[in-house]
């Protein structure tokens, strides 16, 4: 089992002009969502970006899922 970095995502002006990247890589998080949006399987993303582990990608997707649910709950409560 891979130990995931903390935090999962790094934002620094030193890397990709401050775009969120997978911590420990120079891979933009947006690339993962671009693949998903295009209907490409996670395995294809992982093959194209071998510096990102499956566990790391899934953890970022889970983070996004939790954020979406939290946002939807706030909107529903209004």
Go through each PLM region and give its residues:
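Long, charge-rich, low-complexity alpha-helical segments
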Residues: 27-78
């Amino acid at each position: 089992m891979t130990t995931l970095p903390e935090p999962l995502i790094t934002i620094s002006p030193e890397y990709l002009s401050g775009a969120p990247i997978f911590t420990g890589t120079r891979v933009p998080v947006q690339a993962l969502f671009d693949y998903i949006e295009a209907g490409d399987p996670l395995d294809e993303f992982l093959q194209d970006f071998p510096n990102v582990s499956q566990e790391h990608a899934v953890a970022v997707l889970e983070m996004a899922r939790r954020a979406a649910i939290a946002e939807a709950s706030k909107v529903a409560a209004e």
